[in-house]
């Protein structure tokens, strides 16, 4: 299996490098195409009207590419630019920090994986729900061991690992996306010369819906959430056709 590995933390991020080593040792053909610098929270943005520069880096089993663009750029370039063999799977991560609930819309990690889906390649996004993690090996091993069981299809699987030692994980839950609600989102500050500014911060409110990814990780479980790119509200679609007296063009 050819695996394209990318992220939004940058080419040299320990989560990505640990995942590369783990998957390569498991016998997979792994290729890295990742941003050349930190690109967190860039969502699904792509680079227009600017060139994309790539820098080659030697890997134990081939060549990796650091790209001057966004995470989605990396996946587009890898697949549509044919700088690596066509992948059978895109894996984005391991991210430094969680990608849970509605935060996936801001996530460069999840968006890179979704770009693979849009280009016809199954994808996985992997995040470790800690901003101070130093050991990504348990998360990487979980991914490697889970690959044969995930029944990869045309969509995306979003995996979040709890911020706990592996022996303290309570298990695995298959979940739906929660709604990340933040408290105290903006801090009002003053710059040295007196100019006011705002610093985006905030903490996520505790989740109470036990079916969600937020709740699972909050309680110490690994969360696995299947996702797809179709954002259509089919209930509203039907209601609007009826209320506007429009016939279904597909009938």
UniProtKB/Swiss-Prot annotation:
GO terms for cellular component: cytoplasm. Binds 1 divalent metal cation per subunit. It catalyses: a ribonucleoside 5'-phosphate + H2O = a ribonucleoside + phosphate. It is found in: Cytoplasm. Transmembrane segments: none annotated. Belongs to the SurE nucleotidase family. Nucleotidase that shows phosphatase activity on nucleoside 5'-monophosphates. Its main location: cytoplasm. It comes from the Bacteria. Its cofactor is a divalent metal cation. It comes from Desulfitobacterium hafniense (strain Y51). Its EC number is 3.1.3.5. This is 5'-nucleotidase SurE. A divalent metal cation binds at residues 8-9, 40, 95.
């Amino acid at each position: 299996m050819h695996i394209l590995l990318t992220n939004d933390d940058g080419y040299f991020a320990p989560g990505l490098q640990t995942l590369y080593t783990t998957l390569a040792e498991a016998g997979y053909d792994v290729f890295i195409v990742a941003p050349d610098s930190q690109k967190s929270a860039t969502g699904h943005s792509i680079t227009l009207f600017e060139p994309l520069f790539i820098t080659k880096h030697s890997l134990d089993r081939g060549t990796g590419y650091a790209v001057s663009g966004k995470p989605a750029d990396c996946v587009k370039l890898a697949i549509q630019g044919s700088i690596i063999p066509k992948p059978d799977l895109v894996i984005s991560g391991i991210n430094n920090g969680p990608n849970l609930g509605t935060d996936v819309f801001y996530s460069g990690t999840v968006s890179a994986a979704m770009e693979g889906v849009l280009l016809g390649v199954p994808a996985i996004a992997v995040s470790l729900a800690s901003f101070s993690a130093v050991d990504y090996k348990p998360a990487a091993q979980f991914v490697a061991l889970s690959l044969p069981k995930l029944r990869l299809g045309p969509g995306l699987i979003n995996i979040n690992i709890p911020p706990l030692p592996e022996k303290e994980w309570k298990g695995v839950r298959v979940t739906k996306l929660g709604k990340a609600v933040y408290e105290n989102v903006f801090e009002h500050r003053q710059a040295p010369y007196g100019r006011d500014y705002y610093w985006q911060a905030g903490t996520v409110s505790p989740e109470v819906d036990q079916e969600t990814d937020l709740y699972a990780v909050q309680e110490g479980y690994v969360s696995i959430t299947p996702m797809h790119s179709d954002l259509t509200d089919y209930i509203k679609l039907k209601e609007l056709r009826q209320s506007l007296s429009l016939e279904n063009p597909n009938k």
